[in-house]
Amino acid sequence: IFNPSKLEYMRVVKEDGKVVSHVPVAPREVVVNGDRFTIGIISPTGTHADYRHRGHGTRCLRDCLRLMNESDWPVSVLWTREATFPFYHNSGFEAVGPQARGYPLRPRDHDVFERGHHDIVLYNPGNPDHLEAIIDIHDAERLRISRSREEYEHLLTLPKMTTLLAMDMGHGVAYLVVSRATNKLGIIEGGGDARALEALFKQSLLLRDS
């Protein structure tokens, strides 16, 4: 979101000649069984400690919601800590529980996954076949976030991100994106053949163990 081309999606409040509060909304197209609609993702928000409790963050957030209404984006999504729920609830957001199960994995858990016959390689941004394979795998998912080629390239080359590819007869059949960043720690996303994904999980845990 922090890109000059995205300025229209950022809202700020200035006081004493400086920016003291900021809330962006990032539009993302969601694909569900062929149907498409746009959601607005709220993140990351912040207000300078010396200027909090003055309504600045709320003003920014509500202007983002105004933009969503004018753009016909029917749903807004955000991930936050429980302590901030009242702030968002005040502007119409509701807390929801997880819609799926999560399983924490430790490096030693690699033993529960089969390695299989797949060759595993690191994603190479300079190899167009790698990018094409990941795009084809992701775009075949019935439930997904739609991305442009440039957005794929950006995601896969973010700092502290590692992308693993499982190859079968020279073709990419699964991928796994793993992050070491403190704000997005762990597995970001993956897709493809189930057996190949299992091999990628095993390899990612072995890499963490090393």
PLM regions and their residue ranges:
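Conserved acetyl-CoA pyrophosphate-binding loop and the N-cap/start of the following alpha-helix
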Residues: 51-63, 195-204
